[in-house]
Amino acid sequence: MRVLGVDPGLTRCGLGVVDGGPGRRASLVEVGVVRTPASDEVADRLRAVSEGVDEWLDRVRPDAVAVEKVFSQANVRTVMGTAQAGAVAIVAAARRGLPIGLYTPSEVKAAVTGSGRADKAQVGFMVTKLLDLPEAPRPADAADALALALCHLWRGPALARMRAATPARSPGVPGGRR
């Protein structure tokens, strides 16, 4: 399975692609960052992120996309930009009918380091080891995108099976009962 991980952001949107599957070691396909100047208007920055994500989706042709869930931050402006960039990636994947996994930072950290409280250096170190890279991807947004892709590679299939096994609830009815 090929997974595109997206670490959303307006200034730097990390993108990382890994291949892997049951019984196979994960391998790096590509990693990079879409950058936008802080001086540009938000609409222009979002368009640049959208175009970058579209280009990656068309070129690397992933089987799934993993996006970091936005978490609460003190800086509302930062969290808004992160949420908007994440939404752009989600819509791009949805338009192509790709499965989308959303993961909190602590879920991603736990998946790649064993601890949901790992710092950026620990995540970068483990991504480097897990993908057998000569050095940690830079900037940290790129390493985080690869960590997201690895998280989905390992957790996505199990989550999909759990969703498929859970009975659908009737819409608009609390608890799904009539």
From Swiss-Prot:
Keyword presence, Metal-binding: yes
Binding site for Mg(2+) 2: E68
Alphabetical UniProt keywords: Cytoplasm, DNA damage, DNA recombination, DNA repair, DNA-binding, Endonuclease, Hydrolase, Magnesium, Metal-binding, Nuclease
Pfam families on file: RuvC (PF02075)
Keyword Nuclease: yes
Binding site for Mg(2+) 1: D7, D141
Cofactor, how bound (note): Binds 2 Mg(2+) ion per subunit.
Cofactor dependence: Mg(2+)
Listed Gene3D superfamilies: Ribonuclease H-like superfamily/Ribonuclease H
InterPro entries registered for this protein in UniProt: RNaseH-like_sf, RNaseH_sf, X-over_junc_endoDNase_Mg_BS, X-over_junc_endoDNase_RuvC
Molecular functions per Gene Ontology: crossover junction DNA endonuclease activity; DNA binding; magnesium ion binding
Chief place where the protein resides: cytoplasm
Localisation per UniProt entry: Cytoplasm
Active site: D7, E68, D141
Catalytic activity: Endonucleolytic cleavage at a junction such as a reciprocal single-stranded crossover between two homologous DNA duplexes (Holliday junction)
A Gene Ontology cellular-component term: cytoplasm
Stretches that traverse the bilayer: none
Alphabetical list of CDD domains matching this protein: RuvC
Subunit annotation: Homodimer which binds Holliday junction (HJ) DNA. The HJ becomes 2-fold symmetrical on binding to RuvC with unstacked arms; it has a different conformation from HJ DNA in complex with RuvA. In the full resolvosome a probable DNA-RuvA(4)-RuvB(12)-RuvC(2) complex forms which resolves the HJ.
Membership in a protein family: Belongs to the RuvC family.
Protein name from the UniProt record: Crossover junction endodeoxyribonuclease RuvC
Organism: Parafrankia sp. (strain EAN1pec)
Lineage per the UniProt record: Bacteria, Bacillati, Actinomycetota, Actinomycetes, Frankiales
